[in-house]
């Protein structure tokens, strides 16, 4: 009877060791190629064929693809936080240009225009930039705000030149 119980336990232990729990990944397990292979196998048992990389042999997977697969299946919060950061970045881009400083964003060529006027004030063609500002419904006060971060003694006269030229451009339209 004792031999039967010992044999039964040995067979049971062998079955448990060769067929690990498909739902559980040990938190303290070492990261190794065997652990990676086992993780991918477990992921494949849950959702087979949802991502093209999952159908590839494990040794052909790039590490970035492996991280993406694991992050999207094992830790969905990572994927969610990434999408949330993309949404917040899109919201920041869609804010009104009037609220953004010229250092944050070169608003429709304002800084390029200032550099051009500094180098060749008489020959600089400002109408393309003025056309963009006109389409954005910028008034002369808004145009002045574009240059607030670049205002100093050296640039002040050039900025006044640009603002005055823009006022004249708006009157002509």
UniProtKB/Swiss-Prot annotation:
Q: Does the keyword Glycoprotein apply?
A: yes
- Motif RxLR-dEER per UniProt: ranges: 41-55
**Where does the secretion signal sit in this chain?**
1-18
UniProt keyword Glycoprotein, yes or no: yes
Top-level lineage group: Eukaryota
Q: Which residues are glycosylated?
A: 155
Q: According to the record, what induces this protein's expression? A: Expression is up-regulated during the late plant infection stages.
Question: Where is this protein localized, as stated in its record?
Answer: Secreted; Host cytoplasm; Host nucleus
As for what it does, the entry says: Secreted effector that suppresses pattern-triggered immunity (PTI) in plant host.
Copy the domain comment.
The RxLR-dEER motif acts to carry the protein into the host cell cytoplasm through binding to cell surface phosphatidylinositol-3-phosphate.
Q: What is this protein called?
A: Secreted RxLR effector protein RXLR-C12
Species name: Plasmopara halstedii (Downy mildew of sunflower)
